[in-house]
Amino acid sequence: DFIKGVSFPTNILYAGMLVSAGILYKDDALIKKSAILSERINEFSFDGKYYCDNAETEGGKLKPCRNHVSETCQYYALFFEIAKNRDFKERMANDFSLPQKDNPDGVVKSSVFIGNFLRIFWLLKEKRYEKILSETKDYFYDMSVQTGTLWEKAEPTASCNHGFASCM
């Protein structure tokens, strides 16, 4: 169960909110709190290859669930700049892509919202424009041809006219 206990994607989102609020309100205490939380996330969630999604308390200690690794959690870490490891960033940019069916190392695949959008927005921050263009065409083109819309999922099994996809 990927959301049991401490959720690292939720804590990453919280760290992102703290730093944004700190910048907006010129509050160094919020920025520092975000930096400390980011360090803890890297300490507990990142194993040198991937960020695990959650941790549970066992005997009063936080124990990361190393077998709970989703593609979406990786994109949270990248988009919110928790991930600093250059090799990790390159691996996520090059070994993963929107249209692929299976991920390396059994990493659980993202859905369109929010994981795939985080990937696209992270690639945009990284100025990888050709990669964004290629992946969005590969992923969304067939949808647009079939229904003239963008879908909630990769297959037409749910909403085939999804509002979140309008940001594309």
Where are the predicted features?
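Active-site core of glycosidic bond-cleaving carbohydrate-active enzymes
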Residues: D1-M168
